[in-house]
């Protein structure tokens, strides 16, 4: 192993992996299994996956503590982890000089041995990914799911193949997945010029990661890459940005950029659907999930609360329809799917007040959806690292959706307080535990208290899961 102070000027293989977290390690593992040589660089002196890397590739050269320019000057291919911006000067210069700059998703797309179904969006990605995976499993399909959620995509290719006697041709043959169902972030899509997915969806677009992107258009452009080479485009007809993406795809020269390539479009939304689209219909006083004129199931039979989860369910149904999953299996999954932790998760009812953990609400759009989706009077706990976001949409949602108290924590609490001035009672606390205690004292029977921060967690917590766990523990401590 080489360090910054022990530099070998012969860069083996001319492939550089940038970043040695979970994704970088999966890239190293995949290349090592294929017998390809590479070097690894990381800005940290002790990256988290270093020890495991050295068990996979004991002789690999590592350059730690910075991004050494000479490493990139000799690179033909640079595999960038999602947490590293391609705008880093050494990476941008290498790309200008002809190096191929990709991420793990491009490698995955090249080597995937089954159709890819891909999900992105500012909010709802993990819910739709796991919901669709459950639909496929209830249909009896062997699928692999991962990506931004859970297992890195290259590790999906490296997993031991599973013998499934009821699906294999002769009862002994290892069975490939019927589909890879993958959640993708904008960071992953930045380096994915052409995914060639069988089906893909952009669930929604709202401002996020504005500390990484110059503006919303740059963020949106990264998301749009998911449709390149896609056979079935699933689109949210309620989202103007997504529909603009669709028009761009329809206007693209398919032979050059591969945006639809003889494919089709399926739309979903919360309005009444036409033809083969998915949406909501009212019948005999009840609201139904519907495909065209066909009512599929009452919306209130879903386990997940919130109007935003109806949109998630409709997106999953549209993707499942493209995959030709049986309708009964898809609806069964919707009736039983419990949701994921930290996503509008019911915690407890104490003295008539319902407490919800939506710690995964790390951007303004997610919190707006949580507020709109939760009926009745509400107390909102929010705040953290706003990542340069505009909080104005939060102000409008609070005015329109019966939020009578906002309790703020974290780095950008003063910024949010200024945005909400004059529209709602706002209190600031120094800790999440103090926010819970204050919410308990100021809430009334019939209220819902929602932790939905509209911010990242890293100013006060390890991650959004840590933040959610602290909230849940604080709420449970209120129990008599």
Model-derived features: positions:
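N-terminal leader/targeting and accessory segments in enzymes
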Residues: 1-103, 107, 305
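Nucleotide phosphate-binding/pyrophosphate-handling subdomain across enzymes
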Residues: 4-14, 26-34, 297-403, 418
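Phosphate-binding loop of NTP-binding sites
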Residues: 13, 30-32, 69-73, 82-237, ...
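Short beta-strand "acidic-cap" motif of Rossmann-like dinucleotide-binding folds
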Residues: 37-42, 144-145, 181, 267, ...
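Short internal beta-strands
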Residues: 37-44, 234-237, 381-382, 402-411
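Beta-strand->loop->alpha-helix junctions that form or flank phosphate-binding loops
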Residues: 42, 64-66, 103-107, 146, ...
């Amino acid at each position: 192993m080489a360090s910054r102070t022990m530099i070998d000027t012969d860069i083996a293989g001319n492939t550089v992996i940038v970043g040695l977290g979970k994704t970088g390690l999966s890239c190293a593992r995949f290349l090592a299994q294929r017998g390809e040589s590479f070097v690894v660089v990381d800005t940290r002196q002790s990256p988290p996956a270093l020890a495991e890397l050295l068990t996979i590739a004991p002789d690999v050269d590592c350059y730690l503590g910075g991004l050494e320019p000479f490493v990139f000057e000799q690179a033909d291919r640079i595999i960038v982890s999602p947490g590293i911006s391609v705008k880093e000067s050494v990476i941008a210069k290498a790309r200008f000089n002809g190096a191929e700059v990709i991420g793990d998703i491009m490698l995955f797309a090249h080597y995937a041995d089954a159709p890819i179904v891909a999900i992105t969006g500012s909010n709802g990605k993990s819910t739709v990914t796991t919901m669709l995976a459950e639909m496929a499993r209830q249909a009896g399909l062997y699928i692999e799911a991962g990506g931004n959620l859970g297992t890195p995509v290259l590790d999906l290719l490296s997993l031991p193949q599973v013998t499934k006697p009821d699906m294999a041709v002769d009862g002994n043959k290892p069975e490939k997945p019927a589909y890879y169902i993958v959640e993708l972030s904008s960071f992953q899509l930045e380096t994915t010029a052409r995914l060639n997915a069988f089906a893909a969806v952009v669930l929604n677009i709202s401002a996020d990661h504005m500390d990484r992107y110059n503006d919303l258009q740059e963020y949106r452009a990264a998301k749009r890459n998911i449709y390149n080479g896609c056979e079935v485009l699933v689109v949210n007809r309620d989202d103007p940005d997504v529909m603009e993406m669709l028009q761009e795809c329809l206007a693209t020269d398919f032979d050059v950029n591969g945006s639809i390539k003889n494919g089709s479009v399926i739309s979903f939304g919360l309005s009444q659907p036409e033809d083969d689209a998915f949406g909501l219909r009212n019948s005999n006083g009840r609201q139904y999930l519907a495909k065209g004129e066909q009512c599929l199931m009452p919306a209130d039979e879903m386990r997940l609360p919130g109007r935003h989860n109806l949109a998630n369910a409709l997106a999953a149904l549209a993707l499942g329809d493209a995959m030709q999953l049986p309708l009964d299996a898809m609806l069964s999954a919707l009736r039983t799917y419990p949701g994921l932790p930290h996503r509008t998760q019911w915690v407890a009812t104490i003295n008539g007040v319902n407490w919800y953990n939506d710690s995964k609400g790390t951007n303004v759009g997610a919190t707006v959806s949580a507020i709109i989706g939760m009926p009745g009077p509400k107390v909102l706990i929010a705040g953290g690292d706003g990542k340069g976001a505009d909080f104005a949409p939060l102000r409008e949602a609070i005015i329109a959706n019966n939020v009578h108290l906002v309790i703020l924590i974290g780095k950008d609490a003063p910024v949010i307080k200024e945005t909400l001035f004059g529209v709602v009672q706002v209190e600031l606390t120094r800790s999440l535990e103090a926010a819970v205690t204050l919410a308990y004292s100021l809430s009334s029977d019939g209220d819902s208290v929602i932790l939905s921060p509209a911010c990242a967690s890293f100013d006060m917590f390890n991650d959004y899961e840590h933040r959610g766990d602290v909230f849940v523990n604080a709420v449970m401590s209120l129990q008599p």
